[in-house]
């Protein structure tokens, strides 16, 4: 048996009916040339032959003395984990997203390994889909994306590729923070006590400076600046998932014309979409929304190590002009990255944990609903740069399906694939009605920036 880390156990303790703690991914494929009408059925038969899962997909939970452990499941039943399903006609993307929304709402059985794979046929246009989900205590979102990518091939002629549960495990790598890793960062404050204590003077000084700067400049973000908003209401267990691909060239062209990074432009697009959505719901706060955003602090071309921090970014939702909104976002992100870059890794980690503490405290106890560090999570994750195939089928899109939390009812996660940015929006269905309209508002956000940039 293997004990779960404190952070992984925390994802289990946080789980409740209205707050499932699994991450997922939707992959959309087109049929290979010459594929017959039984192609997906034959693919399902092939996948069923992989009945012996590799680690960690053969592990189930057990509990001793109040703590969770992993142990091998000696009664593994593939039929429970792998499901072959069909969409109702007419099999549009609307029906597919409705199906994923319903599946992502369901809790998983803790008496079995905490993962599922859904092979979905009947998608209009000779396409099929894969929806994978796994509990965050078993695998984090970034690792799930890497595993799903490793199951693919750049060769359209490669056949008999195993599914992700049957791949040989790789040595665990340091990964970028995912949308819920601010919870994990809170637990780090109790680890390596000597090192952590030595960071306290710097952390307190930087928090104080950020509060002072926020008092002098309303566009600067500090720890308690996020306004109350419908995005931060209590959630139910019902989910709505929306997804769309947007051209990366359009985003890059805006950034080049307006001297902004691609991440800045993405935040501006999201800020525009959220502003229009909240106006439509008669719920736009007077103060700007604050996003929690993982960003890179790497100063060189090195690849090793983890040089990622989670910052708070002003989304400028109180500003109607798209150019002015982008300027506020650029300044906000630049200020936050500068502050982080001047700290040691331990100081940056603890600064992140302290600034996220109000949200973490409320999430764990519900005692401080007025202490809101941020309103929404926006993550941008690198994906495959070349076209990918799975048993001859071309991957057309790859969309993250993430975790809304009580008080953080919307999660926006992006994945880059080839020349596309794949947006995956996951929200509480009741808290944020008609959330799928955000897709139209995202397109509008791109168009208004293109106009502002004279493109």
Question: What do these predicted regions represent?
Answer:
Residues 1-8, 26-37, 44-55, 59-408, ...:
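Soluble acyl-CoA-dependent acyltransferase catalytic core bearing the H(X)4D motif
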Residues 14-19, 367-368:
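Short secondary-structure boundary/capping segments within folded domains
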């Amino acid at each position: 048996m293997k004990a779960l880390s404190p952070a992984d156990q925390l994802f289990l303790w946080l789980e409740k009916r209205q707050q499932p703690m699994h991450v997922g991914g939707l992959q959309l494929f087109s049929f290979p040339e010459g594929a017959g009408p039984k192609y997906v059925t034959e693919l399902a038969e092939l996948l069923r032959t992989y009945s012996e899962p590799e680690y960690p997909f053969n592990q189930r939970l057990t509990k001793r003395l109040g703590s969770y452990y992993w142990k091998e499941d000696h009664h593994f039943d593939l039929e429970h984990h792998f499901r072959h399903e069909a969409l109702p006609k007419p099999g549009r993307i609307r029906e597919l997203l409705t199906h994923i929304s319903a599946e992502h709402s369901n809790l998983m059985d803790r008496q079995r390994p905490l993962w599922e794979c859904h092979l979905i046929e009947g998608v209009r246009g000779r396409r099929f889909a894969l929806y994978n989900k796994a509990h965050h205590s078993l695998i984090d979102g970034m690792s799930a994306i890497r595993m799903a990518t490793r199951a693919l091939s750049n060769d359209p002629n490669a056949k008999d590729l195993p599914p992700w549960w049957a791949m040989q495990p790789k040595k665990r790598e340091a990964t970028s923070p995912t949308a819920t890793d601010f919870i994990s960062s809170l637990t780090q404050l109790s680890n390596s006590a000597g090192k952590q204590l030595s960071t306290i003077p710097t952390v307190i000084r930087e928090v104080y400076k950020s509060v002072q700067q926020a008092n002098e400049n309303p566009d600067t973000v500090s720890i308690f600046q996020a306004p109350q908003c419908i995005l931060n209401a209590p959630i139910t267990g019902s989910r709505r998932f929306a997804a769309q691909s947007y051209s990366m060239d359009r985003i890059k062209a805006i950034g080049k014309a307006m001297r902004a990074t691609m991440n800045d432009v993405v935040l501006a697009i999201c800020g525009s979409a959220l502003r229009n959505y909240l106006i439509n719901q008669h719920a736009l706060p007077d103060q700007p929304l604050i996003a929690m955003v993982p960003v890179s602090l790497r100063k060189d071309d090195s690849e090793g190590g983890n040089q990622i921090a989670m910052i708070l970014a002003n989304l400028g939702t109180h500003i109607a002009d798209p150019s002015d909104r982008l300027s506020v976002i650029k300044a906000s992100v630049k200020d936050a990255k500068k502050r982080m870059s001047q700290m040691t890794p331990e100081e940056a980690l603890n600064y992140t944990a302290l600034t996220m503490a109000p949200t973490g405290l409320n999430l764990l106890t519900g005692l401080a609903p007025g202490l809101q560090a941020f309103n929404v999570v926006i993550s941008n994750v690198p994906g495959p740069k070349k076209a990918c195939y799975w048993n001859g089928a071309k991957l057309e899109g790859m969309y993250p399906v993430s975790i809304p939390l009580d008080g953080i009812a919307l999660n926006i996660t992006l994945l880059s694939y080839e020349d596309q940015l794949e947006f995956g929006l996951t929200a509480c269905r009741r808290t944020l009605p008609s959330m799928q309209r955000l897709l139209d508002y995202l397109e509008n956000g791109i168009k208004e920036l293109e106009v502002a940039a004279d493109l």
